[in-house]
């Protein structure tokens, strides 16, 4: 099996551990936008690629898949999951399995508010969650929510932007920009 790890970054140990489970003749190919990404250099082959939001990115990845006879592709960063999921058919047309959730599931997982609603609808307890500033402030006015609160962007990963805030002005300043 030949597998392509997109956005390989610093995941050297992950690639090394993955290699331990592979058979002789199997290959790891890594791609990243930075030549400084250490995981590139533990792969059997590596490629420098554009940013995932570059219009040529997907065609670049598909080209690598064809050239390296890739059997499966996955990503090591959250924002790219949706891109692979939404383009699953293009990969399947060239015989490449996408190791990522389907597009609907990827969208659900990347949107914290939608995930909270989904979990609540299925009886899975979650912290109280508001999807926007206005509804959160209405909950404060109704006495359903009190400061301090924990806020984080509705989408994103790596806890970027997650923080404890003590007042409405901070919530507004932090999350309405």
Task: Briefly describe each language-model feature range.
Residues 1-100:
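ATP-binding N-terminal substructure of ATP-dependent carboxylate-amine bond-forming enzymes
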Residues 47-50, 130-132, 165:
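Short acidic-hydrophobic, aromatic-tinged amphipathic segments that line or gate anion-handling sites
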Residues 49-53, 107, 163:
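Pocket-edge positions in alpha/beta enzyme catalytic cores
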Residues 51, 153, 167:
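Active-site donor-binding loop signature of nucleotide-sugar glycosyltransferases
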Residues 93-161:
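A conserved helix-loop-beta module that forms one wall/lid of the active-site cleft
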Residues 171:
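Short amphipathic alpha-helices within nucleic acid-binding modules
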Residues 174-175:
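Conserved small/polar residues in nucleotide/adenosyl-binding loops
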């Amino acid at each position: 099996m030949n597998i392509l790890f997109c956005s390989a970054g610093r995941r050297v140990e992950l690639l090394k551990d993955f290699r331990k489970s592979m058979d002789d003749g199997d290959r790891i190919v890594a791609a990243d936008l930075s030549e400084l990404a250490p995981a590139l250099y533990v792969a059997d082959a590596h490629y420098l690629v554009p940013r995932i939001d570059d219009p040529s990115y997907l065609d670049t990845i598909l080209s690598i898949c064809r050239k390296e006879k890739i059997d499966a592709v996955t990503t090591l960063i959250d924002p790219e999951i949706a891109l692979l999921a939404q383009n699953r058919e293009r990969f399947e047309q060239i015989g490449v399995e996408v190791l990522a959730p389907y597009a609907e599931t990827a969208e659900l997982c990347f949107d914290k508010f939608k995930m909270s609603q989904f979990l609540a609808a299925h009886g899975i307890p979650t912290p109280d969650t508001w999807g926007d500033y206005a509804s959160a402030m209405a909950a404060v006015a109704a006495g359903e929510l009190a400061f301090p609160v924990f806020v984080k962007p509705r989408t994103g990963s790596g806890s970027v932007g997650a923080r404890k805030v003590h007042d409405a002005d901070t919530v507004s300043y932090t999350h309405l920009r």
